[in-house]
């Protein structure tokens, strides 16, 4: 049965609250709030009892899918289990009750946490300095590109091109375009890595930087990264790393050691903060020595035993947020790093790589692998075999997976893989869970061959059956009158 909207449950006069009396004298609302800010008609809020509100949202939560419920295999999203200790520290009154405009002497604990987190992130990635301010990965991308632009301006360079590999996240060219750059695509080779000949042919005096993800979006490590770094820097360009896949690198290797000048982190992914449903995120940016003068203000500095916000950065590109970043995510990431330590972080990446390769080995006979293995933390399969032989598309496979109790993986991305199924199991899934997930995909491959109509009509057991995705995207109806 369809769950009704909270407004459909409303009945006039029904209440779920009671207010105690007070001794304050009554007075017209206009005496307190200027009339231009007052409504001319009453708000059409739902009138429901407390029990109805609780039951409504509990029912909705039971319909929802989340990482606390089961494996969440979205490729390039790192939907790992988020330790509850992270939420505990985030909820401590000394953090949760803060206001960003409080005097510095009353926020020393928060400033210390941010200072130490930046230092830990700097060390993890091998960079010279880190800003915590950007609110998400794409926000960090834009910040990094603006830092690159400022650097070139500071040396009198008017470079206007930015190279982006063809397997990149769509936010890479979008961020570069927002910063005013012309986007040039660099091809991949037959092994799924950057084509050095194509890169060499596109490097000229107008190229400001190359944006690269390592491991790339197919889950492959760029084995020629040192050669790429030399080519880019010999051209007077800078090297940018999208840190979306840093869950494969912790304690094993560092972007700074590969020659990257800028890297953004996705704290909500790599360092375990809940981020389904659009946020919150955090996208700190690490830079090499020559970009430090341009970092965002304010910068947290330590003077003796005191932490302060410093605005004395005349070459800074300014702010990317009104305040200092998504602080709750920073607290969670700090807790995660401190709980695991250097050895634990390395085990995170080692186990993520092991899980991805183990799961891939279970699926190879039933699905196509467009590029060679081994992979790092994720892999990209193709549903071409099922589509060509049985008329079952990757979309159908993803929908059918819902009937088996799993969230679907990322599909149709990256664009260079036909009928793409991008899967990232993360380090927090057990062998038993991976086995069950693999068996679900193997069963779907068998169904595609023997009962394709079942797969193309899926899902059939979920509370809501197959949606018209195109209509849902183009004809939004999410508003209500208040």
Curated annotation (Swiss-Prot):
Query: What organism does the UniProt record list as the source?
Result: Pelodictyon phaeoclathratiforme (strain DSM 5477 / BU-1)
Q: How is this protein named in the record?
A: Probable glycine dehydrogenase (decarboxylating) subunit 2
Q: What does this protein do?
A: The glycine cleavage system catalyzes the degradation of glycine. The P protein binds the alpha-amino group of glycine through its pyridoxal phosphate cofactor; CO(2) is released and the remaining methylamine moiety is then transferred to the lipoamide cofactor of the H protein.
GO MF annotation terms: glycine binding; glycine dehydrogenase (decarboxylating) activity; pyridoxal phosphate binding
Name of the coding gene: gcvPB
What EC designation does it have? 1.4.4.2
Q: Name one Pfam family in it.
A: GcvP2_C
Q: How does the annotation summarize its subunit structure?
A: The glycine cleavage system is composed of four proteins: P, T, L and H. In this organism, the P 'protein' is a heterodimer of two subunits.
Which example biological process does GO assign this protein? Answer: glycine decarboxylation via glycine cleavage system
Q: Which coenzymes or cofactors are required?
A: pyridoxal 5'-phosphate
């Amino acid at each position: 049965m369809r769950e009704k909207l909270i407004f459909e449950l409303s009945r006039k006069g029904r209440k779920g609250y009671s207010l105690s009396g007070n001794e304050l004298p009554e007075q017209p609302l206009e005496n307190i709030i200027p009339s231009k800010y007052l409504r001319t008609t009453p708000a059409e809020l739902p009138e429901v009892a407390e029990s109805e509100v609780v039951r409504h949202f509990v029912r909705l939560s039971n319909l929802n899918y989340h990482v606390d419920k089961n494996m969440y295999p979205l490729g390039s999203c790192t939907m790992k289990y988020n330790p509850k200790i992270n939420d505990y520290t985030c909820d401590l009154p000394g953090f949760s009750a803060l206001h960003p405009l409080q005097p510095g002497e009353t926020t020393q604990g928060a400033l210390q946490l941010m200072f130490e987190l930046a230092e830990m992130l700097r060390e993890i990635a091998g960079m010279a300095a880190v800003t915590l301010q950007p609110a998400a990965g794409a926000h960090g991308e834009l910040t990094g590109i603006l830092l690159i632009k400022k650097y070139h301006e500071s040396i009198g360079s008017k470079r206007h091109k930015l190279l982006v590999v063809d397997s990149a996240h769509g936010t890479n060219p979008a961020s570069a375009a927002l910063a005013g750059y012309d986007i040039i695509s660099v091809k991949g080779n037959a092994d799924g890595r950057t084509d050095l000949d194509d890169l060499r042919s596109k490097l000229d005096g107008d190229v400001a930087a190359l944006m690269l993800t390592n491991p790339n979006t197919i889950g492959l490590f760029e084995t020629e990264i040192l050669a790429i770094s030399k080519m880019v820097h010999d051209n007077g360009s800078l090297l940018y790393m999208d840190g979306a896949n840093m869950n494969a690198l912790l304690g094993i290797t560092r972007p700074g050691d590969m020659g990257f000048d800028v890297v953004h982190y996705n704290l909500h992914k790599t360092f375990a903060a809940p981020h389904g449903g659009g946020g919150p995120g955090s996208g700190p940016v690490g830079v090499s020595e020559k970009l430090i003068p341009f970092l965002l203000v304010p910068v947290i500095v330590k003077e003796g035993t005191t932490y302060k916000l410093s605005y004395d950065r005349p070459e800074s590109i300014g702010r990317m947020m009104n305040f200092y970043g998504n602080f709750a995510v920073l607290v969670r990431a700090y807790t995660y790093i401190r709980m695991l330590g250097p050895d634990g972080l390395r085990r995170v990446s080692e186990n993520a790589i092991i899980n991805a390769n183990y799961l891939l080995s279970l699926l190879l006979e039933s699905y196509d692998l467009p590029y060679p293995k081994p992979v790092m933390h994720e892999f990209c399969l193709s549903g071409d075999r099922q589509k060509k032989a049985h008329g079952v598309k990757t979309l159908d496979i993803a929908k059918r997976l819902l009937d088996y109790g799993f969230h679907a993986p990322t599909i149709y991305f990256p664009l260079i893989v036909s009928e793409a199924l991008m899967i990232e199991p993360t380090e927090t899934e057990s062998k038993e869970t991976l086995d069950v997930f693999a068996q679900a995909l193997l069963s779907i491959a068998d169904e595609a061959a023997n009962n394709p109509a079942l797969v193309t009509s899926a899902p059939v057991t979920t509370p809501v059956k197959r949606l018209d995705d195109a209509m849902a995207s183009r004809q939004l109806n999410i508003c209500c009158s208040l």
